[in-house]
Amino acid sequence: MLSARSAQCMVSMATRSCVSRGSAGSAAAGPVEAAIRAKLEQALSPEVLELRNESGGHAVPAGSETHFRVAVVSSRFEGMSPLQRHRLVHEALSEELAGPVHALAIQAKTPAQWRENPQLDISPPCLGGSKKTRGTS
């Protein structure tokens, strides 16, 4: 059974985009999120592009755009290894990864793979932060 979130994304396949907000998300995408979405759409012509800003779950200021999770579904991934798929995503986002983006979790799937499991994975809780918050000095 599909969750409401997955059902929304399946409906969104017709428009090739899926609106998603993480714990740091707001009603409108920030400039980094917008750039990531535009660059992946241009580079990969995805059938599904689901992007979640997960910065709010990390030790960063409110409203940050530093930690993202993306599910990108493209026929361009056919016949490629997971490493090759991730390299395509990294190539498209080289500016963001060299600057404002600290972490990017990637699910790069073919359309057939997405149909088998049409959902964006959930990240585990952040265990990072300053050394003082981890109990060391």
From Swiss-Prot:
Region (Disordered): 115-137
Record keyword Phosphoprotein present: yes
Location(s), subcellular: Mitochondrion
SUPFAM superfamilies referenced in this protein's UniProt entry, alphabetically: BolA-like
GO cellular component: iron-sulfur cluster assembly complex; mitochondrion
Domain of life: Eukaryota
Residue positions where Phosphoserine is found in the record: 81
Keyword list, A-Z: Mitochondrion, Phosphoprotein
Biological role stated in the UniProt entry: Acts as a mitochondrial iron-sulfur (Fe-S) cluster assembly factor that facilitates (Fe-S) cluster insertion into a subset of mitochondrial proteins. Probably acts together with the monothiol glutaredoxin GLRX5. May protect cells against oxidative stress.
UniProt subunit comment: Interacts with GLRX5.
Recorded family membership: Belongs to the BolA/IbaG family.
Protein name: BolA-like protein 1
Species the sequence originates in: Mus musculus
Organism lineage: Eukaryota, Metazoa, Chordata, Craniata, Vertebrata
